[in-house]
């Protein structure tokens, strides 16, 4: 091979620029501009809203979808009142019901009740948010149970189906700031993996239509091989690390779940103080903050949501824009991890700090001590701990810091579950430890993260 050709390939691989058609796109600038949006609204609204299902059954009657008072302008004004600068809307979730009149399926809004036949909710959303001065993004699930887009069943026909739907979304609704893709390369559910549906296949397709649309793969791992922006799944104990330099997005919920359910109109929501602290931390660690606010079955935001978003806006002052991207380094660099035991190589201690929800630590069956310790190699100051567990086995635990030659209790709790998140007095220490005191069976601990708000 010609040496000059080899050199050209090397330069292209290292360059922040990407050639799309005849257009040169500076991906670093696109990513920097996205991070500087700081604060966004995630909007989960789809068939699950009407079924009290977070993963809706994929064969509900389209006529069950009844947005009787849909008002996307209300959503947009709510986002504006909170100081949000972009939004992401669920065009299609894992059940495969599309909220636009897709030409490749009848399982969509056009097949709902006749009064909604001409309703295009994606257009209603994009128009309303643009008119409010808010950038628009879309959410799209490639795991589509209605149309058979599932692991082990991926073929050229359903890949073409997926591409055609993405073409519709990226052609008919103006400039799309980002597209969050879910159900892809994830161990939750049964979506396609990256061998069945290579990341490059969809990224290239998306960028052939909209070169500046960021592809954000919601795969719950800090790996830029499969995404342009890492999405930290805050609802499952995956928190932006204290030393994060990866361009990222953190996604918590204002209500207790992604989709609205009956009774949420009276629910105690995430507090203003929590949101402001999480937002400020994310923004100071190369991450923007995408807060989910779910509309109700009428297609409206509940009054408690409207009030809370306005309170958040009154309490929020966004930080100054980033001027450049940092050098990207692995998360939790330099930390050593020790554990009382591990049940096998697959469940090694280091998994607890890799920011990957699908790797986990598990102690051995005969372990009576059941602790895992993080040594930061030098004193670090923290006041919050976040821990995520898979399958909910822990019944009692404690978290400690090693100070003046002894372990000092920081937090004691019962269940960890998906997302244990607690504050403690500000402490400076080199070593921190989690001990499982009681469990119904061998637990799987996905992440243990310490930060300072």
Task: Name each region found by the language model.
Residues 1-23:
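Bacterial Sec-dependent N-terminal signal peptides
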Residues 21-350, 363-366, 374, 381, ...:
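Mature catalytic domains of secreted/periplasmic carbohydrate-active enzymes
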Residues 351-357:
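Acidic, glycine-anchored loop motifs typical of Ca2+
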Residues 389, 401-403, 452:
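Residue-level signal for short segments within beta-strands and strand-turn junctions
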Residues 393-405:
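Short, surface-exposed beta-strand/strand-loop-strand elements in extracellular ectodomains
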Residues 429-431:
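Extracellular Ig-like/FN3 beta-sandwich strand-entry sites
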Residues 442-453:
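Exposed low-complexity, polar/acidic, P/S/T/G-rich flexible segments that act as propeptides
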């Amino acid at each position: 091979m010609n040496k000059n050709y080899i050199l050209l390939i090397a330069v292209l691989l290292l360059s922040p620029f990407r050639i799309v058609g005849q257009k040169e796109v500076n991906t670093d600038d696109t990513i920097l501009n996205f991070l500087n949006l700081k604060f966004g609204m995630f909007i989960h609204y789809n068939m699950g809203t009407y079924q009290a299902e977070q993963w809706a059954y994929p064969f509900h009657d389209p006529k069950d979808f009844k947005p009787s008072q849909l008002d996307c302008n209300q959503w947009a004004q709510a986002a504006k009142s909170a100081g949000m600068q972009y939004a992401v809307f669920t065009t299609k979730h894992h059940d495969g019901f599309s909220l636009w009149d897709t030409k490749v399926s009848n399982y969509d809004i056009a097949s709902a009740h006749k009064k909604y036949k001409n309703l295009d909710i994606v257009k209603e959303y994009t128009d309303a948010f643009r008119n409010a001065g808010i950038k628009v993004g879309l959410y799209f699930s490639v795991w589509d149970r209605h149309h058979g887009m599932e692991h082990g069943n991926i073929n050229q026909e359903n890949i073409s189906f997926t591409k055609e739907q993405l073409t519709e979304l990226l052609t008919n609704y103006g400039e799309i700031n980002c597209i969050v893709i879910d159900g892809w390369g994830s161990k939750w559910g049964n979506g396609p993996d990256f061998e069945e549906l290579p990341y490059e296949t969809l990224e290239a397709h998306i960028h052939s239509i909209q070169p500046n649309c960021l592809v954000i793969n919601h795969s719950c791992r800090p790996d830029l091989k499969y995404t342009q922006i890492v999405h930290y799944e805050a609802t499952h104990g995956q928190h932006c690390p204290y030393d994060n330099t990866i361009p990222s997005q953190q996604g918590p919920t204002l209500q207790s779940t992604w989709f609205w359910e009956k009774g949420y109109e009276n629910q105690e929501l995430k507090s203003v103080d929590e949101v402001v602290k999480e937002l400020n931390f994310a923004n100071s660690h190369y991450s923007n903050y995408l807060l989910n606010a779910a509309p109700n079955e009428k297609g409206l935001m509940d009054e408690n949501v409207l009030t809370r978003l306005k309170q958040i806006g009154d309490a929020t002052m966004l930080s100054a824009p980033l001027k450049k991207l940092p050098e990207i380094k692995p998360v939790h660099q330099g930390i050593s991890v020790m554990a009382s035991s591990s049940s096998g190589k697959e469940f090694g201690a280091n998994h607890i700090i890799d920011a990957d929800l699908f790797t986990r630590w598990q102690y051995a069956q005969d372990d009576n001590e059941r602790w895992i310790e993080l040594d930061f190699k030098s004193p670090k100051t923290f006041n919050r701990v976040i821990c995520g567990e898979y399958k909910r086995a822990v019944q009692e635990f404690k978290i400690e810091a090693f100070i003046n030659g002894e372990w000092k209790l920081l937090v004691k709790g019962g269940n960890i579950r998906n997302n244990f998140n607690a504050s403690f007095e500000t402490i400076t220490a080199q070593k921190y430890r989690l001990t499982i005191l009681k469990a119904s069976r061998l637990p799987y601990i996905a992440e243990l993260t310490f930060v300072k708000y």
